[in-house]
Amino acid sequence: MQHPILVIGHRQGIGRAIAEQLCQAGHTVLGVSREAVDYQHSHLTSLTFAAEDLTVEHLPETLSGVVYAPGSINLKPFKSLKPADFLADFHINALGATHVLQVAEKALKAGQGSVLLFSTVAVSQGMPFHASIAMAKGAVEGLARSLAAEWAPHVRVNCIAPSLTDTPLAAKLLGNEARAATAAERHPLKRVGTVADIAEISCTLLRSTWISGEVIGVNGGMGRLRTA
């Protein structure tokens, strides 16, 4: 990947892990986050503003890839969800990605680039209290497949659908040993995911030149396996 890779949401969590792994591999990364990052690397240029404020002027003429990592975990009983909840989840997950990709389309096509979006295992596996986020992430999966077809053969577009991953966003769900143990037990591989797990497959998908239109489950076996 000889041109810069745009990573949206590189301050923490999965986005940070991807940005750091790309930099360590020698790739040039342009990171965008709402808040300033607390790390530096010679291959990293960080911009501090919301993804919705991204413009063509912020980008190089050519990109090797775009990673859209922002997300939300808004778990509520269906009867408690308000229209604002659905709109907030859709805005950050689906519309945010849409804006970034519309801005980056020309640079991606110039670089024969790769796009990586993020869904959740809850789209394919029915889970209580996930109605809002599953709807929003389902839209992300549809976006990934549609753009993979529309932008072929110039740009590859893929999506990762993780299960629960140990990130700041998931801190409330993994806030003590009991909760963490319960979460781990739900997975056939008996642990929750790490940002390193997600970053590893993310970088593979960004590099691959013959994978497109796929939603890849990285979920400790939760998506396919039943062990009890």
Spans of model-derived segments:
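A glycine/serine/threonine-rich, flexible loop-to-helix segment
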Residues: 164-186, 225-228
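Conserved NAD(P)H cofactor-binding loop of Rossmann-fold oxidoreductase domains
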Residues: 67-75, 221
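Conserved Rossmann-fold SDR core element
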Residues: 141, 151-165, 211-218
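N-terminal Rossmann NAD(P)H-binding glycine-rich loop of SDR-like oxidoreductase domains
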Residues: 11, 15, 19
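Substrate-binding pocket helix/loop in short-chain dehydrogenase/reductase
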Residues: 77-78, 82-88, 179, 183
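C-terminal substrate-recognition "lid" of short-chain dehydrogenase/reductases
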Residues: 192-218, 223
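Catalytic loop of short-chain dehydrogenase/reductase
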Residues: 112-139, 144-152, 164-165
